Amino acid sequence: AYVDSAFNQPPTHELFVVEDIPNLHISFANATYMVNLRPGLIMADTGCKKAVAGSEWHQEIQRKMDKKGKGYCSYPIHEYFKFGPGHPIPAVRGWNYNVGINGFNEQIQIAEIDADVPGLCGPDDMARWKMKLDFEDGTIQTNGRKTLLQPSKTSHPCICLFQFPKTEHYKMYDEHIT
């Protein structure tokens, strides 16, 4: 009765605290949370079939690539990407990037779409890098070498694309595999 009367009153901008009331279900409207990554990070997304990112993400990564003198080039692509219940979004183009993954030179192909989407890489890229995530010790392993996880503000695991060999930009842990 208290909950019913509290929710049926006109808004008073007061805070009502509800504790220990069985069978109380409050649903919130669908909220959208934008994920903004620091430039140079790509999110590990096991549901992503192909690496993809929005135009703004590509512009940021290309500015950083230019500063570092690292190569990249575009190529034509004819693919569509769908996120949740939204409509399919056509790719504008694809990009080949020369990146540094945990101290190793690598390449990655990332589709560009005209949407506000962070960089996402999928299982194929992660498998190629022999990636293992360890949430217990907060590390990510690629090609047998560990480094600290770089989570997004939403706690999604991210990979830095600018950890080139012999850089001082990250803390790295070597792990001997026997």
Pin down the residues of each PLM region.
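C-terminal reverse transcriptase regions that engage the nucleic-acid substrate
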Residues: P76-A91
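Aspartic protease core domain of the pepsin/retropepsin superfamily
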Residues: A91-T178
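Intrinsically disordered, low-complexity interaction arms of viral/retroelements
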Residues: A1-R38, Q163-T178
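Generic recognition of well-structured, leucine-rich alpha-helical segments
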Residues: Q59-E60, K68, E79, A127, ...
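Compositionally biased regions
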Residues: A6, F28, Y75, K153-H156
